[in-house]
Amino acid sequence: MYLMITAMKAQIESIPCKICGDKSSGIHYGVITCEGCKGFFRRSQQGTVSYSCPRQKSCLIDRTSRNRCQHCRLQKCLAVGMSRDAVKFGRMSKKQRDSLFAEVQKHRQQQQDDKTGDESEKNQESQAPGEAEPLTPSYALSSSGVTEIPDDLSGYVNGQTQEEGKADSAIGGFYLDIQPSPDQSGLDMDGIKLEPVCDLSSDSGLDQYCCYSNGDASPPHDDLEHLSENICKSHLETCQYLREELQPSNWQTVLQSNLEAYQKKSQEDMWQLCAVKVTEAVQYVVEFAKRIDGFMELCQNDQIVLLKAGSLEVVFVRMCRAYNSQNNTVFFDSKYAGPEVFKALGCDDLISSVFEFAKSLNSLQLSEDEIGLFSAYVLMSADRSWLQEKTRVEKLQQKIKIALQNLLQKNKRDEGILTKLVCKVSTVRMLCRRHMEKLSAFRALYPEMVHTRFPPLYKELFGSDFEQILPQEA
């Protein structure tokens, strides 16, 4: 009986999520869904949750867009049959069970037919060299930034279960069952004042990047073009909001009444709210990393190390897209907010630095493609501690740097802009360290609150072993 149930569960999980099309994890509230949509629907039934659609109540809900409109996502949940009663009673009716069983049988037959067809095609065709296989992420983003995945990061990246994903790693578990965690998309540092001087002595500012640091020749031009296109496409597909959606004219700035409400929040509540927003942004960064050619070929340990050390750095970089230079505000909690909104955090110096960094990077007026390649360069840093295959990571980072250089030249940017961007890496790392200092102080005051109310992802990202992963700054 147990084996039969296990086999049936495996068949059910082969059917994509009915809400967003992602990898499903079983039957939840009467419908086959992924963990993220299950958690989203459960939370939508708790308390007095109210969602509204900023568009025409007809938003497309799929794996990459499901987090953009809670209203349309909930309506789709209800339309496909997710039951409010199931939240209370946790059971399916006999009719629902029979219907699902029939669907599993149909899907099984379809898979067999497809397999037969695929085998015949494989005898005639082979995959083009260098062609990337489509990724099927096993994680899901909820509208509140909460993920429902009980797997560690190794399973999260590779789509394995927790049992399958248990591999030796210098940094252990990296749980992504995300709930709330402090928002660092608003954390900068004193920008230019703290920006270390970069020792890049080449006169050209660009030619120094035309070979690998180990002396190997540059990769073929076609390889660089392919990598550049892959990263730029992945960036656009994994941005939380399109740049058009972030136009300040589409959103309100925090009003005085709203400002007072934020400032009256307790320090604990404000940290938690910010945590949710950062966690939400980090999940998009993880998806971005998974789509970068070469990342999934790295060993599992190195994937985890790079994500753990670099995901917040990329969140900071992406912040420049959501910065309004007209009034020194960033997009936060569905409004454009100034530094004063974050007063309750008790981190005025850190918040000031965050805004200064966003302003500094925004002033470079980077295109989306330039932001995407720079984000990938920041993420694939070969100087992280605990990397097992530093040379492979270094070669990937160097390829990304050369691709970025080529793009900047193609866009006729000033020669010195690449040097400026490389210097920003030290700045953003210093920001992350300052955030760690603030978090440590907060955790010392409210250890129980951090333990019980902060998202697991946030706690894993910025736990006691986080600083061991970061390269030591001079």
Swiss-Prot record:
SMART domains: HOLI (SM00430), ZnF_C4 (SM00399). One of its GO terms (biological process) is regulation of transcription by RNA polymerase II. It is found in: Nucleus. It comes from the Eukaryota. Residues 14-89 bind DNA. Transmembrane segments: none annotated. Residues 450-461 are annotated as: AF-2. GO terms for molecular function: nuclear receptor activity; RNA polymerase II cis-regulatory region sequence-specific DNA binding; zinc ion binding. Residues 223-461 form the NR LBD domain. Belongs to the nuclear hormone receptor family. This is Nuclear receptor ROR-alpha B. It comes from Danio rerio (Zebrafish).
